[in-house]
Amino acid sequence: MGVIVGDRDLCDDSRDVRWGVLGAGHISHRFASSLKEVDGAQLVAAAGRTPAHVEEFCRAFSIDTAHGYASADDNGCAAYDALIADPDVDAIYLALPHGMHTHWACRALRAGKAVLCEKPAVLSEEEAHAIVSVSCECGVLFMEAMKNRFCPMHARVKDLLASGELGRVVSIESVQKLDYGESPSSYLLDPLQGGCLYDMGCYAVGWFEDLLAGACDVSSREVRWRDVPGGNVDWADDVHMSIGGVPIHMVCDGMAEYESRLTIICERGSLEIERLHRPELAHVKYSDGRVIEIDVPFEVDDFYGEVSHATQLIQAGKLESPVMSLAATQRCAHIIDAIRMTP
């Protein structure tokens, strides 16, 4: 017997997966644009707080307005519940602010809807355990949308390191910088869910988690705080840590000129990956002086890989991703917790 998602048996790759989105903002627009290129997928519903935004989203992506849900008075809650209850929706792309992920992911899973949840999926390891428990209890797929793992460059990097050509990994450095400006998104200024570690640092943590086994130990964290109503948020982080004994230097900065790279130092050379959150270009520098450029373009765009992968998992009746597993989401949350709890 196949796995039942919503009201249909989806262990049949001839059946389209019918997606709905929770949150009709910029990220959902990017998801919807990529989904149009995915075989076996349809976007059939959208929910948000603002009626005008939901109406615009439905028009932009040819969604029947009967499946466009909005409720401004309760921060969108009635709209999100209505979409989750929609019998014509099989799977949900969860693009609400980070702090709302756990609640709405669990509600969707309990309703039998598969969930693709934007990064960071959770704000703590405790929240990760809660989602994993519900996913396993209900037998419904949950996957964190850690898009860099689904870019073709990611597999190339893993293959190169696994080949042993560069030897073992000696250390890793990540640098992520951008200028948030004076008026960033409101969730970035929320003391409970804002700051640059959650927003961009989670991408670097995703690389660390995937490349290195073993325990995480954070030796130091220097933070530049920004005062906001109700507290403060980290506007820059400089972290020294190790995983499995491999030293890591991690930099996130929301008040700097753009830079994004991951440098993996190995015994016989190094691998520098540009734009670590959406990688297409890397340089291999060998100890003998040779430098090789690796160019691995996206298939369609940087969202397509994760969206296509999730759709295929749902069609196949899988309960988790082999690329971004439930254990990986929990371990990423554990690493971020360790960083955040370092004085």
Stretches found by the model and what they are:
Residues 228-235, 243-312, 318-327:
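NAD(P)-dinucleotide binding in Rossmann-like oxidoreductases
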Residues 122-181:
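A contiguous active-site-proximal alpha/beta segment in oxidoreductase catalytic domains
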Residues 41-45, 65, 90-92, 194-195, ...:
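Short active-site oxyanion
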Residues 91-147:
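Beta-strand-loop-alpha-helix segment that lines the small-molecule cofactor/substrate pocket
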Residues 182-257, 263, 327-330:
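Rossmann-like dinucleotide-binding domain that binds NAD(P)(H)
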Residues 1-63:
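N-terminal Rossmann-like dinucleotide-binding module
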Residues 1-13, 91, 129, 312-343:
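C-terminal helix-rich "cap/oligomerization" subdomain common to oxidoreductases
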Residues 51-85:
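Conserved N-terminal Rossmann-fold NAD(P) cofactor-binding segment
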